């Protein structure tokens, strides 16, 4: 009973984390309207998160070996700089719908990666894979919302797929790291290497908006939200959930992202909740339940 209650709590934390991430598009859009680029927003939010994490977690600066330190750098790239840059840049070449469909399919690829890396047959049950596929179909229904209009763009779709694979690899790397290091230490390193590896971007596109921009309440407030809550706390809770639930269970929660985005858009922007959304949401929830019930070998 205690284990079951713990699993419910871990899932609630994962859902809440994904729900918060599903609302960040509003904050990002506000900041972009105030003159900040996606790369600048990423740099600032991760810098804020790193400074805050360093204040609470500073006794240990480096991993036990250079191999582990290299793994931390990969986490910072796949879960930070490369993920955010490829996702945001994809929308300059293709539609938001295409980008959302490809990026939100990362749980399916994470499941397949676990199957490839951990080859024993108990790792991924066929019913679990079917549950993940059902959730994937539900995600497609929610994102399309009854409008089957896709625009193929090789460059944009390739960038979106890069972001998708980045998050899947990030989740897989996190699984192999959480047994040796605390979620707080790993999260701090993710922020550090995320900021470090985005710096070459400024060689080609230097500069930040004038200081006056950052004194605006909407800019200051949204940067604090993205840095403190959406980055520091959410990455910390996400990494903790992966350590408790495992890669497949935790990453399947990403399918829930379009649901929270649509609900928030309905509340803030007045967008309509359609029968397609309800059907897709039902598929996502049922698929996640089936996949979770059959996740026996992966913990």
What do these predicted ranges mean?
Residues 53, 73, 105-107, 113, ...:
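Hydrophobic transmembrane alpha-helices of multi-pass small-molecule transport proteins
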Residues 28, 33-82, 107-114, 165-173, ...:
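Transmembrane alpha-helices of multi-pass small-molecule transport proteins
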Residues 6-10, 34-39, 43, 64-70, ...:
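Juxtamembrane helix-entry segments on the extracytoplasmic side of multipass membrane proteins
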Residues 12, 41-44, 80, 84, ...:
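Helix-helix packing/entry segments at the starts of transmembrane helices
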Residues 23, 27-30, 49-65, 116, ...:
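Membrane-interface helix-cap regions at the ends of transmembrane helices
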Residues 1-40, 77, 150-179, 198-200, ...:
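Glycine-/small-residue-enriched transmembrane alpha-helix faces in small-molecule transporters
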Residues 24-25, 54-103, 140-141, 227-245:
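Specific transmembrane alpha-helical segments of multi-pass solute transporters/efflux pumps
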Residues 31, 41, 90, 116-119, ...:
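Hydrophobic/aromatic residues within transmembrane alpha-helices
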């Amino acid at each position: 009973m205690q284990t079951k209650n713990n699993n419910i709590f871990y899932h609630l934390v994962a859902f809440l984390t994904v729900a918060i991430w599903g609302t960040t598009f509003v904050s990002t859009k506000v900041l972009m309207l105030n003159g900040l680029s996606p790369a600048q927003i990423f740099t600032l939010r991760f810098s804020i998160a790193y400074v805050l994490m360093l204040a609470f977690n500073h006794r240990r600066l480096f991993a036990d070996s250079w191999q582990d330190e290299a793994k931390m750098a990969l986490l910072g790239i796949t879960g930070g700089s490369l993920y955010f840059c490829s996702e945001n840049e994809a929308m300059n070449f293709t539609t938001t719908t295409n980008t959302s469909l490809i990026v939100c399919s990362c749980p399916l690829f994470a499941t397949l990666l676990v199957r490839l890396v951990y080859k024993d047959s108990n790792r991924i049950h066929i019913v679990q894979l079917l549950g993940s596929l059902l959730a994937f179909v539900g995600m497609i229904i929610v994102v399309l919302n009854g409008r089957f209009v896709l625009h193929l763009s090789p460059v944009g779709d390739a960038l979106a797929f890069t972001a998708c694979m980045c998050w899947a690899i990030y989740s897989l790397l996190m699984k192999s790291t959480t047994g040796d290091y605390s979620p707080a230490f790993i999260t701090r390193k993710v922020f550090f290497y995320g900021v470090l590896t985005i710096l070459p971007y400024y060689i080609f596109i230097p500069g930040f908006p004038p200081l006056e921009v950052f004194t605006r309440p909407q800019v200051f407030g949204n940067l604090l939200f993205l840095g403190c809550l959406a980055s520091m706390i959410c990455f910390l809770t996400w990494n903790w959930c992966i350590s408790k639930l495992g890669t497949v269970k935790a990453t399947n929660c990403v399918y829930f992202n379009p649901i929270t985005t649509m609900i928030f858009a309905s509340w803030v922007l007045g967008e309509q909740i359609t029968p397609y959304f309800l059907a897709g949401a039902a598929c996502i929830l049922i698929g996640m339940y089936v996949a979770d019930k059959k996740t026996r070998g992966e913990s």
